[in-house]
């Protein structure tokens, strides 16, 4: 774990280390051209973890997902998926993009769209085998899409489209599942159903990393939350954060203790109850003060809840 990471979980939390992690990122530097987006980024994810990835626009969430999938070569550092390089292990990585990134006007059915998730395994311009269709139908069943398998994808609702993208990722039987804003544009019942399915997958040993701007959904869905500001600068159990703390962190205020060194071997020691700056009652987000407190006072979680 990188120096400067704020950790709210116990140092004995299994999320902080494993002998056989699904994903291991060490001292990663990555970006575009001469612009470094990720700097000395380290993260370990273990089998069965459901982790929310938080950060403002431009913080590095998309860059991280691209690097994990082997679509972006890092300047330095390492990414290992199941002990192999990201490119070698891509067949075991399922990716759920944002809905607008998929071509929904393409004239194919739901089952054919899900089969496109197996293109890398099958090969371009090759016909799927029976074993491929078995995996596709299993993914359709997991996502409750079997009744819609022959429907053109252009006729689907937003929630149905999100389930198609998930089924497409599940068709590769992933060990690591990457989700990019999976709750955008879906209604509450669909979000609840998807969350339950993600939890089931995690319970079966699938490691899930969900990039999202939805702080409430991340805290309600995930067991662990990580935050990126170029490097990994927030990490802990979801239950150890309040929504106010996460909102403040995403919008630029620091948790007390941020910047302190972590312990040896990447296991951080326990930290005190975090103190944060939050928007004042008058809507000013710069001061983080309340009436009766001097300028620069950092509001505690207890004061936030008051």
For each feature predicted by the language model, list its residue ranges:
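Conserved ABC ATPase "signature" region
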Residues: 130-148
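H-loop/switch region of ABC-family ATPase nucleotide-binding domains
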Residues: 212-213
């Amino acid at each position: 774990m990188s120096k400067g990471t704020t950790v709210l979980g116990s140092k004995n939390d299994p999320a902080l280390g494993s002998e056989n992690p699904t994903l291991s990122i060490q001292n990663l530097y990555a970006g575009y051209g001469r612009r470094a987006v990720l700097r000395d980024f380290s993260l370990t994810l273990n089998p069965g973890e459901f982790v929310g990835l938080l950060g403002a626009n431009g913080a590095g969430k998309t860059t991280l997902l691209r690097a994990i999938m082997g679509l972006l070569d890092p300047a330095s550092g390492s990414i290992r998926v199941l002990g192999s390089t990201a490119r070698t292990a891509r067949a075991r990585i399922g990716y759920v993009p944002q809905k607008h990134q998929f071509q929904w006007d393409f004239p194919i059915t739901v089952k054919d769209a899900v089969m496109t998730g197996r293109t890398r395994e099958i090969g371009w311009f090759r016909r799927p085998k029976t074993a491929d269709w078995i995996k596709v139908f299993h993914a359709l069943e997991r996502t409750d899409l079997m009744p819609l398998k022959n429907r053109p994808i252009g006729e689907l609702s937003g929630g149905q489209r999100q389930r198609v993208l998930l089924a497409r990722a599940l068709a590769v039987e992933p060990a690591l599942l990457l989700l990019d804003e999976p709750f955008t544009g879906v209604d509450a019942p669909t979000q609840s159903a998807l969350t339950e399915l993600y939890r089931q997958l995690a319970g079966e040993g699938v490691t899930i990393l969900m990039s999202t701007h939805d702080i409430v959904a991340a805290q309600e869905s995930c067991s662990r939350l990580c935050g990126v500001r170029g490097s990994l600068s927030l990490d802990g159990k979801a239950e150890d954060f309040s929504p106010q703390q996460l909102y403040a962190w995403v919008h630029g205020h620091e948790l007390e203790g941020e910047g302190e060194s972590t312990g040896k071997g990447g296991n951080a020691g326990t930290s005190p109850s975090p103190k944060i700056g939050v928007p004042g009652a008058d809507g000013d987000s710069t001061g983080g003060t309340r009436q009766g407190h001097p300028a620069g006072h950092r509001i505690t979680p207890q004061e936030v809840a008051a």
